[in-house]
């Protein structure tokens, strides 16, 4: 039986509660691919952070999470890119990478930090 996008969202929320950055990363990419999202936006605000997906031209909020997890999540993306420096927070960085999702789909992604 295939796992649905809703089940991956539940897993993402569970990963956030447990502060499991590896699972947050894996579930976020899988949800994005399975939802046919063109973009993933990870945004920090003063009191919280959020993840949004661009689907059919619209940004849709996926989840909010505590600001205490933000640096770890961004660092995970930078490390997985293999081309970004996790310790660089002042300058924008770009990378391209091919990876596999939890559903064994190969994806090509471009990551940018601002």
Where in this protein do the model-derived segments appear?
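N-terminal "pre-motor" subdomain/linker immediately upstream of P-loop NTPase catalytic cores
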Residues: 2-114
């Amino acid at each position: 039986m295939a796992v649905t996008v809703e089940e991956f969202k539940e897993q993402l929320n569970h990963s956030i509660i447990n502060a499991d950055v590896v699972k947050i990363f894996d579930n976020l990419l899988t949800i994005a691919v399975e939802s046919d999202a063109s973009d993933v936006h990870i945004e920090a605000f003063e009191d919280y952070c959020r993840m949004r997906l661009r689907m059919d031209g619209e940004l849709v909020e996926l989840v909010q999470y505590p600001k205490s997890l933000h640096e770890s999540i961004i660092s995970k993306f930078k490390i997985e890119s293999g081309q970004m420096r996790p310790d660089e927070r002042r300058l924008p960085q770009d990378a391209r990478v091919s990876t596999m999702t939890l559903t064994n789909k190969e994806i090509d992604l471009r990551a940018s930090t601002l």
